[in-house]
Swiss-Prot record:
Membrane topology type: Peripheral membrane protein
Identification of the protein by name: NADH-quinone oxidoreductase subunit I 2
Entry binding sites for [4Fe-4S] cluster 2: C61, C100, C103, C106
Species, as recorded: Streptomyces avermitilis (strain ATCC 31267 / DSM 46492 / JCM 5070 / NBRC 14893 / NCIMB 12804 / NRRL 8165 / MA-4680)
Binding-site residues, [4Fe-4S] cluster 1: C51, C54, C57, C110
Keywords in alphabetical order: 4Fe-4S, Cell membrane, Iron, Iron-sulfur, Membrane, Metal-binding, NAD, Quinone, Repeat, Translocase, Ubiquinone
Family: Belongs to the complex I 23 kDa subunit family.
Residue ranges, compositional bias (Low complexity): 172-209
GO cellular component, one term: plasma membrane
Chief site of localization: membrane
Localization, UniProt: Cell membrane
Cofactor note: Binds 2 [4Fe-4S] clusters per subunit.
Organism domain of life: Bacteria
Length: 216
């Protein structure tokens, strides 16, 4: 049987009429902010204090959108008799988000936890050059990085936390030992000063010497 002319249009209008009577489900962005899933990839934040300028992130980036400049400085020895050493100092760290494809390789390969994902995605610009975020802007994104999920109570303690705790305990023990040594030295100095004062008092001549025999 040949289809009735206009039946397809009628079916389409029927679907439209049924949909018009239902409640809308469209999220009116930006009036209603979306609920992002965990581990959303929005923008990359830089924790500059952890960066050692190893250049690993820039070398592994497939888009070559990470720009790093640095210089070397000489650090004096930490202890007397030690040797000076040189270290890299970060001058520039920038990411061009107009080239970035958000693969996350730079975050994965960073051995010092200096790069993190932030769920923030509202950084559109009218000028493409503004999408190159320098280290000050990347630091601002760092404060929008969500806290890591809580550890499972039955899980083993991470080795980084265990190492940090051991280091803190050693430092506290060294400080306590140094304080005890200082206190003992202070007590010894006080005792020595008191002994010297007593010896000086015993050896001092009397204020009124006795007259010798034959003197009036």
């Amino acid at each position: 049987m040949a289809p009735i002319p206009g039946s397809g249009l009628a079916k389409g209008l029927a679907v439209t009429l049924r949909t018009m009577t239902k409640k809308t489900v469209t999220a009116q962005y930006p009036d209603a902010q979306p609920e992002l899933p965990p581990r959303s990839r929005g923008v990359i934040g830089l924790f500059e204090e952890n960066c050692t300028v190893c250049m690993l992130c820039a070398r592994e980036c497939p888009d070559w959108c990470i720009y790093i400049d640095s210089h070397k400085e000489t650090v004096p020895p930490a202890a007397p008799g030690g040797r000076e050493r040189s270290r890299n100092v970060l001058d520039r760290f920038a990411i061009d988000f107009s080239l970035c494809m958000y693969c996350g390789i730079c975050i994965e390969v960073c051995p010092f936890d200096a790069l993190f994902w932030s769920p923030e995605f509202e950084y559109a610009e009218t000028d493409i050059h503004e999408l190159t975020h320098e280290r000050d802007k990347l630091r601002e994104w760092m404060w929008t990085v969500p806290a890591p999920p809580a550890l499972d109570p039955a899980a083993e303690e991470p080795k980084e936390i265990a190492a940090a705790r051991k280091t803190a305990e050693k430092l506290a023990a060294a400080q306590a030992a140094a304080a005890q040594t200082d206190a003992a030295q202070a007590e010894a100095a006080q005792a020595e000063a008191a002994a010297e004062a007593g010896s000086a008092a015993e050896g001092a001549p009397d204020a009124a010497p006795k007259p010798q025999e034959g003197e009036a």
